[in-house]
């Protein structure tokens, strides 16, 4: 998936917290950019979504961080706003909320907000830049016209490659000065092959800081887990596109040479006519011409077939227009805890795992295009899965929020598109055998299995520090991230991804640094803080995660 840093960014944004009185749980999280040139993960740690419910989630963005950050900001409220949630039907509420936020990504208002998060210029900004560029070209042409209007004939001839001290060059028509070079002009008229060209911009500005999610309890380290506070620096990746200001000058023709150029063109046409006559005299038959036409028709048909196949295999961005939410998206795994019920919704390949008497119990299913159910839906929607497991040669996920480039079949509902935002739901009744659960992105699960992660945490969760206190859960997560980090980028990409992980213990822990309930920030407060921070941090970089 794109470029890596020369050295991994191992700065971690970590935090710990406790639950509400009715949910005496504890949690710790950490997030690390790693080898990636930007951080595209986000998360939620909300121990009190309402007085009876806690919410924990991880979002793994691809094609940019904007959709993941948008989900972390708005999905909690969208879940609560669902009619099913108010009726206590949490499974239905999660399904409806996933589809609702996915649909919002196609609205003009949300697209503009996503563009701001991603640091991409809006259409208005593009139009202003285009007008400014055209004004610059007009000013350059006016200056050139003024300069050439004051020049002598000898100076003009010298500028355009003519020598006024020699006789006129011979042409086949017996007159004229030949064709002038097309590098510049006298009167500002553009040549047929030389309109101003602009290098296409990928709009990848310099990498900016990214926060990793929203939490509403005590945190430490960089405190980037709190809503809206900038997370770890993502490292300077530098600009990834050519400057749009480096333009070729518009080529203009000189009126002074128009007559000679017309005469030269006539001479060339006469020469072409004579060549055609000589070819016929040399025995070039009409039958041979027909054979060549048949061959041309066959080649054109083959080219048409290739173009159709390429169109089917197009990936976001190939159409020349990039739009957040269309060429970017995110996985989402959301866990709600209410009383003794654990409800987990998942779309994508982030994962939730519960430790049940030391055994890993998967509470989510990784959605991959090559899976039988997913493959059938993709084909029914008109898509293909390549040998390397990519939908139409692009995305290697089969469910995600966003990615509306793959959701354009108007004959099918949202849940039946090539890429669907409809989550799978699993429900578990918690017992004393269930000690903790882990929610993490595939940066963890691509390196370690569910059981390996459970074993790793199990071996450290009872450890105590020098003061006799149990280790903070976030410190265990930090150690897990370091364990998963690859030593270099020479391999297949394993251990080189962004990493975000949350550990939630279903029972309270005796740790000195955890703050009491009174120290907790309300969700509304952190959301308002996020809005203020985001307005001052618009220089973000688009990073492709299609791997």
Curated annotation (Swiss-Prot):
Q: Which superkingdom is the protein from?
A: Eukaryota
Q: Which residues carry this modification: Phosphoserine?
A: 183, 528
Q: How does it sit in the membrane?
A: Lipid-anchor
Residue ranges of the region described as Disordered: 117-139, 161-329, 513-547
State its Enzyme Commission number(s). 3.1.3.16
Domain PPM-type phosphatase positions? 26-506
Q: Where does Mn(2+) 1 bind?
A: 60-61
Residues modified to N6-acetyllysine: 384
Which top EC class is given?
A: hydrolase
Q: Residues bearing Omega-N-methylarginine?
A: 22
Q: Which UniProt keywords apply?
A: Acetylation, Cytoplasm, Hydrolase, Lipoprotein, Magnesium, Manganese, Membrane, Metal-binding, Methylation, Myristate, Phosphoprotein, Protein phosphatase, Repeat
Record field: compositional bias (Acidic residues): 123-139, 259-313
Q: Which residues form a coiled coil?
A: none
Cofactor section: Mg(2+); Mn(2+)
Name a GO CC annotation attached to this entry: cytoplasm
- Which GO MF terms are attached to this record? metal ion binding; protein serine/threonine phosphatase activity
User: Which reaction is this enzyme known to catalyze?
Assistant: O-phospho-L-seryl-[protein] + H2O = L-seryl-[protein] + phosphate; O-phospho-L-threonyl-[protein] + H2O = L-threonyl-[protein] + phosphate
Gene3D superfamilies the record matches: PPM-type phosphatase domain
Similarity annotation: Belongs to the PP2C family.
One of the Pfam families matching this protein, by short name: PP2C
How is this protein named in the record?
A: Protein phosphatase 1G
- Tell me the residue numbers annotated for binding Mn(2+) 2: 60, 442, 497
């Amino acid at each position: 998936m794109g470029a890596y840093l020369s050295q991994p960014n191992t700065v971690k944004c970590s935090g710990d917290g406790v639950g509400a009185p009715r949910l005496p749980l504890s949690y710790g999280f950490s997030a690390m950019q790693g080898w990636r040139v930007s951080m595209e993960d986000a998360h939620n740690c909300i121990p009190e979504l309402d007085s009876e419910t806690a919410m924990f989630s991880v979002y793994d963005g691809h094609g940019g961080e904007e959709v993941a950050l948008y989900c972390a900001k708005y999905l909690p409220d969208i879940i609560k706003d669902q009619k099913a949630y108010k009726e206590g039907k949490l499974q239905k509420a999660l399904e409806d909320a996933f589809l609702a936020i996915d649909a919002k990504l196609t609205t003009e208002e949300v697209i503009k907000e996503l563009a701001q998060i991603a640091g991409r210029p809006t259409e208005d900004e593009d139009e202003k830049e285009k007008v400014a560029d055209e004004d610059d070209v007009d000013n350059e042409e006016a200056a050139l016209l003024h300069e050439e209007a004051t020049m002598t004939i000898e100076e003009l001839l010298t500028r355009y490659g003519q020598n006024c001290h020699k006789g006129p060059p011979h042409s086949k028509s017996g007159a004229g000065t030949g064709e002038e070079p097309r590098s510049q002009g006298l009167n500002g008229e553009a040549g047929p092959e030389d309109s101003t060209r602009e290098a296409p911009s990928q709009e990848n500005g310099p990498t900016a800081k990214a926060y990793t999610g929203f939490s509403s309890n005590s945190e430490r380290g960089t405190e980037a887990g709190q809503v809206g506070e900038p997370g770890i620096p993502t490292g300077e990746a530098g600009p990834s596109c050519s400057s749009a200001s480096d333009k070729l000058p518009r080529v203009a023709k000189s009126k002074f040479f128009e007559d000679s150029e017309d005469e030269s063109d006539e001479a060339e046409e006469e020469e072409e006519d004579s060549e055609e006559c000589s070819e016929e005299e040399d025995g070039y038959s009409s039958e041979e011409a027909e054979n060549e036409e048949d061959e041309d028709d066959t080649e054109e048909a083959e080219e048409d077939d290739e173009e159709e196949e390429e169109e089917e295999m197009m990936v976001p961005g190939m159409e020349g227009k990039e739009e957040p939410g269309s060429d970017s998206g995110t996985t989402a795994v959301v866990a709600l805890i209410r009383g003794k019920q654990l409800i987990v919704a998942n779309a994508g390949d982030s994962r939730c795992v519960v430790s049940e008497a030391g055994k890993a119990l998967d509470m989510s299913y990784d959605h991959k295009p090559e899976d039988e159910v997913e493959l059938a839906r993709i084909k029914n929607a008109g898509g293909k899965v390549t040998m390397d497991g990519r939908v139409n040669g692009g995305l290697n996920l089969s469910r995600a929020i966003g990615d509306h480039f793959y959701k354009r079949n108007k004959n099918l509902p949202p849940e039946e598109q090539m890429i669907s935002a409809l989550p799978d739901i699993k429900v578990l009744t918690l017992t004393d055998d269930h000690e903790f659960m882990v929610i993490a992105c595939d940066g963890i699960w691509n390196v370690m299995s569910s059981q390996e992660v459970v074993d790793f945490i199990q071996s450290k969760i009872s450890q105590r520090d020098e003061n006799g206190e149990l280790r903070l859960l976030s410190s265990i997560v930090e150690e897990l991230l370091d364990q998963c980090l690859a030593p270099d980028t020479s391999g297949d990409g394993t251990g080189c991804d962004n990493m975000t992980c949350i550990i939630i213990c279903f029972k309270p822990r005796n740790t000195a640094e955890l703050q009491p309930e009174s120290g907790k920030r309300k969700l509304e407060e952190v959301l308002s803080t996020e809005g203020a921070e985001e307005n001052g941090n618009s220089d973000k970089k688009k990073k492709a995660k299609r791997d």
